[in-house]
């Protein structure tokens, strides 16, 4: 690669185009902060679904990444997901804040945030079992 800024800019655009092709092929999802979109750099790249995570590199699959991917995969068809603010995982549509929590996750209950909790059987208040989102798929 050339060290000139023009060549560097072309390279960045090519990489972003390749990432967009992967997203269009439904292999990855790009998560942006509210108000940003392609061709800007996404704040987070995620596999499109959890099966792809285990097929590409099954040795190092983090539980939190699996939970986040599951949540995003169940909602992305009908909703727009953005990077969440501090203390949240995602912002859905225009203001529903969700935090995805693994079993045993410690958090202060914020009434403005919905908590999707792994291994919770029955929901109450703003705490929703993560498995229920699977019915949206």
Feature locations, PLM:
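A short, terminal or domain-edge coil/loop segment
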Residues: 83-91, 130-137
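Accessory nucleic acid-recognition modules appended to NTPase machines
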Residues: 4-87
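Conserved catalytic cores of phosphodiester-cleaving nucleases, focusing on short active-site segments
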Residues: 71, 75, 88-104
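Short, well-ordered alpha-helix to beta-strand connector turns
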Residues: 7, 94, 110-112
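Long, low-complexity, charge-rich intrinsically disordered regions
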Residues: 100-137
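Generic signature of intrinsically disordered, low-complexity segments enriched in small/polar residues
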Residues: 14, 21-24, 93, 117-118, ...
């Amino acid at each position: 690669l050339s060290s000139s800024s023009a060549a560097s800019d072309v390279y960045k655009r090519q990489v972003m185009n390749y990432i967009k092709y992967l997203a269009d092929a439904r292999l990855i999802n790009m998560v942006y902060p509210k108000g940003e979109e392609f061709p800007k750099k996404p704040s987070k790249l995620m596999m499109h679904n959890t099966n792809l995570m285990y097929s590409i590199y099954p040795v190092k699959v983090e539980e939190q990444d699996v939970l986040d991917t599951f949540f995003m995969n169940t909602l992305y068809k009908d909703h727009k997901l953005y990077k969440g603010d501090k203390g949240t995982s995602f912002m859905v549509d225009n203001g529903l804040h969700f935090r995805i929590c693994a079993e045993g996750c410690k958090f202060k209950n914020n009434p403005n945030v919905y908590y999707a909790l792994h291994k919770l059987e029955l929901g109450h208040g703003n705490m929703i079992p993560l498995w229920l989102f699977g019915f949206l798929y």
